[in-house]
């Protein structure tokens, strides 16, 4: 069957009242980004649904692009015919023949919003159903639990027919809740945190700390590949790669071993927060899970968070590791995350890090080093790349060129 469009039904957008238009616009933008390799498609958004006009594009490829996009409750491959009963009959028969299995069951579910069509909803159900039955001997009607449900939507602009409903990713369109910076390591937790933030409409920009020669190019590429996995939910993710070697070396030389990790995380957070400010972000997202490691106790979080007043969103904070792993497997980041390339969070890790660091002592230790200058230098040399849904990354520019 040759489908000519995809019919998209909204999720939580239906509850957004006066803000509905901006949600629909954001969803349309995300769909367009996801369809960059299908330039022939056209997107038409309405108040209660959206259409993707395929113009000859492969509907199965379009279907795969739509599945991960947040803000879509469900969607259906569909065909449009003129407001003519005979055309509706022909299209209905072709759709059911394509979708049914031997000795299967079906039902017709019609809705008529265009009152000038000669049949009302019940008459459409009866006439189209009878026509299909007359032309398919091995088919029977089951109105409660059919194998094939033929939906017919009669509108002023035409009649739309479909036989299959595919569940979407639900949630809110990415970007509808503002922008945040995702602290993206090469581990399991932070990509899951990024995924969950996107599901609630947050546009993420990834921040990755790279410390050559202690961390390899493979570790950097792994982080880029993880960002590409997240890009499929919005079409594109901006990624900022921070040169962090010098700061880590100074921390190792100047800071007591037991609090190296606390100070390291504080410097990461300061850099991320400055990036957030320059990029007009509203929050910082990370993959911290309470009590999982020494830097993720409440006492450690308090000492680390003291460097900023920016909201820190921790989507996985209450999850067990197995729960996080299950989501990582679902979104296809787990196998990447467990690749054995060391990232900057694991180098220089002391054997017995403090789990209850004191903020006043941390600030005292830091006072002997000009970390402001080191942070400014790192910010001046950030590399920014654009990671898109097709899992390609291109160097966009140096960070200084953005401002």
UniProtKB/Swiss-Prot annotation:
SUPFAM superfamilies documented for this protein: Adenine nucleotide alpha hydrolases-like (SSF52402), THUMP domain-like (SSF143437)
Location of this chain's protein in the cell: Cytoplasm
Domain THUMP as annotated: residue spans: 60-165
EC number(s) recorded for this UniProt protein: 2.8.1.4
Entry keywords, A to Z: ATP-binding, Cytoplasm, Nucleotide-binding, RNA-binding, Thiamine biosynthesis, Transferase, tRNA-binding
SMART domains given in the database record: THUMP
Enzyme class: transferase
Positions that bind ATP: 183-184, 208-209, 265, 287, 296
Superkingdom of origin organism: Bacteria
Catalytic reaction annotation: [ThiI sulfur-carrier protein]-S-sulfanyl-L-cysteine + a uridine in tRNA + 2 reduced [2Fe-2S]-[ferredoxin] + ATP + H(+) = [ThiI sulfur-carrier protein]-L-cysteine + a 4-thiouridine in tRNA + 2 oxidized [2Fe-2S]-[ferredoxin] + AMP + diphosphate; [ThiS sulfur-carrier protein]-C-terminal Gly-Gly-AMP + S-sulfanyl-L-cysteinyl-[cysteine desulfurase] + AH2 = [ThiS sulfur-carrier protein]-C-terminal-Gly-aminoethanethioate + L-cysteinyl-[cysteine desulfurase] + A + AMP + 2 H(+)
PROSITE patterns xref list: THUMP
Main location: cytoplasm
GO aspect biological process, one term: thiamine biosynthetic process
Pfam family, one: ThiI_fer
Family: Belongs to the ThiI family.
Known function: Catalyzes the ATP-dependent transfer of a sulfur to tRNA to produce 4-thiouridine in position 8 of tRNAs, which functions as a near-UV photosensor. Also catalyzes the transfer of sulfur to the sulfur carrier protein ThiS, forming ThiS-thiocarboxylate. This is a step in the synthesis of thiazole, in the thiamine biosynthesis pathway. The sulfur is donated as persulfide by IscS.
Name of the molecule in the record: Probable tRNA sulfurtransferase
């Amino acid at each position: 069957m040759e489908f000519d469009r995809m019919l998209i039904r909204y999720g939580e957008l239906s509850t957004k009242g006066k803000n509905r238009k901006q949600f629909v616009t954001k969803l349309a933008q995300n769909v367009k980004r996801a369809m960059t390799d299908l330039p022939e498609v056209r997107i038409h958004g309405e108040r209660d649904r959206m259409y993707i006009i395929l113009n000859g594009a492969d509907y199965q490829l379009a279907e795969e692009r739509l599945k991960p996009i947040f803000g879509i409750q469900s969607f259906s491959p569909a065909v449009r015919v003129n407001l003519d009963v005979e055309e509706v009959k022909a299209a209905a028969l072709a759709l059911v023949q394509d979708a049914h299995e031997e000795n299967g069951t079906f039902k017709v579910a019609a809705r008529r919003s265009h009152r000038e069509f000669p049949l009302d909803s019940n008459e459409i159900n009866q006439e189209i159903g009878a026509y299909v039955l007359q032309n398919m001997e091995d088919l029977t009607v089951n109105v409660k639990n059919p194998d094939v449900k033929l939906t017919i939507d009669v509108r002023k602009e035409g009649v739309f027919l479909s036989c299959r409903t595919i569940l979407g990713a639900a949630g809110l369109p990415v970007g509808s809740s503002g922008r945040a910076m995702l602290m993206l390591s090469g581990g399991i937790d932070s990509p899951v945190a990024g995924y969950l933030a996107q599901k609630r409409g947050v546009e993420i920009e990834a921040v990755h700390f790279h410390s050559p020669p202690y961390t390899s190019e493979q570790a950097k590429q792994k982080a880029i590949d993880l960002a590409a996995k997240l890009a499929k939910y919005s079409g594109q993710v901006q990624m900022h790669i921070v040169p962090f070697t010098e700061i880590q070396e100074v921390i190792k030389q100047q800071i007591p071993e037991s609090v190296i990790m606390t100070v390291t995380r504080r410097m990461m957070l300061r850099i991320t927060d400055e990036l957030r400010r320059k990029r007009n972000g509203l929050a910082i997202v990370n993959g911290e899970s309470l009590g999982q490691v020494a830097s993720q106790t409440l006492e450690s979080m308090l000492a680390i968070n003291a460097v900023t007043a920016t909201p820190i969103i921790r989507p996985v904070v209450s999850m067990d590791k197995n729960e996080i792993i299950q989501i990582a497997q679902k979104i296809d980041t787990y196998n990447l995350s467990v690749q054995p390339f060391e990232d900057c969070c694991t180098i220089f890790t002391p054997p017995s890090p403090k789990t209850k660091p004191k903020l006043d002592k941390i600030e005292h230790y830091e006072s002997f080093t000009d970390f402001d200058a080191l942070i400014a230098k790192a910010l001046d040399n950030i590399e920014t790349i654009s990671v898109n849904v097709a899992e390609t990354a291109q160097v966009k520019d140096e960070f200084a060129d953005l401002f």
